[in-house]
């Protein structure tokens, strides 16, 4: 059995207009994230992990922030595109682990909804998707509530 592991990482700064979209879910918060697309830092990290596992570069290569076509783009559409590339190469996702690093907003009330959206978009069982959150104990830019960072690790298996 052939397997591939991908790691994704993304950061966005607070300061944009609401809504704040994380993992395809609108999370109530006073500001959004500054981004060329919809700023969904969770789905961006997952997309990067999938592309990395497939040795296809990163989301900046596929959806450059200099291209007006992707201005305000729905990150769910971008994620589905990245996953379709993997499917076209004969791979599907076995499991996904995501860590949201943010002092605010509190993520716990939104985790299950985020897992459901990701599972639907990746045509996967929700039990194969883990999303968790942590803080940096008020240290660094996330601790000062200046932005959100996300790491994602994906295991892809040859179909």
UniProtKB/Swiss-Prot annotation:
The keyword Protein biosynthesis does not apply. Belongs to the IspF family. Homotrimer. It comes from the Bacteria. Signal peptide: none annotated. GO terms for molecular function: 2-C-methyl-D-erythritol 2,4-cyclodiphosphate synthase activity; metal ion binding. 4-CDP-2-C-methyl-D-erythritol 2-phosphate binds at residues 10-12, 36-37, 58-60, 63-67, 102-108, 134-137, 141, 144. Its cofactor is a divalent metal cation. Binds 1 divalent metal cation per subunit. GO terms for biological process: isopentenyl diphosphate biosynthetic process, methylerythritol 4-phosphate pathway; terpenoid biosynthetic process. Its EC number is 4.6.1.12. Gene3D superfamilies: 2-C-methyl-D-erythritol 2,4-cyclodiphosphate synthase (3.30.1330.50). Keywords: Isoprene biosynthesis, Lyase, Metal-binding. This is 2-C-methyl-D-erythritol 2,4-cyclodiphosphate synthase. A divalent metal cation binds at residues 10, 12, 44. The record marks 36, 135 as: Transition state stabilizer. It catalyses: 4-CDP-2-C-methyl-D-erythritol 2-phosphate = 2-C-methyl-D-erythritol 2,4-cyclic diphosphate + CMP. Involved in the biosynthesis of isopentenyl diphosphate (IPP) and dimethylallyl diphosphate (DMAPP), two major building blocks of isoprenoid compounds. Catalyzes the conversion of 4-diphosphocytidyl-2-C-methyl-D-erythritol 2-phosphate (CDP-ME2P) to 2-C-methyl-D-erythritol 2,4-cyclodiphosphate (ME-CPP) with a corresponding release of cytidine 5-monophosphate (CMP). Pfam families: YgbB. SUPFAM superfamilies: IpsF-like.
């Amino acid at each position: 059995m052939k397997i591939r592991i991908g790691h994704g990482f993304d950061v966005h700064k607070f300061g944009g207009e609401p809504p704040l979209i994380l993992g395809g879910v609108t999370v109530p918060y006073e500001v959004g994230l500054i981004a060329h697309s919809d700023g969904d830092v969770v789905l961006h990290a997952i997309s990067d992990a999938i592309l990395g596992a497939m040795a296809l570069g990163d989301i900046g290569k596929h959806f450059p922030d200099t291209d007006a076509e992707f201005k305000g783009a729905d990150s769910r559409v971008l994620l589905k595109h990245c996953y379709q590339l993997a499917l076209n190469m004969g791979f599907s996702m076995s499991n996904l682990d995501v860590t949201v690093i943010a002092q605010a907003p509190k993520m716990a009330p939104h985790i299950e909804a985020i897992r459901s959206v990701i599972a639907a978009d990746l045509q996967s069982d929700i039990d194969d998707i883990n999303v968790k959150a942590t803080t940096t104990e008020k240290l660094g830019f996330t601790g000062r509530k200046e932005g959100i960072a996300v790491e994602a690790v994906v295991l892809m298996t040859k179909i």
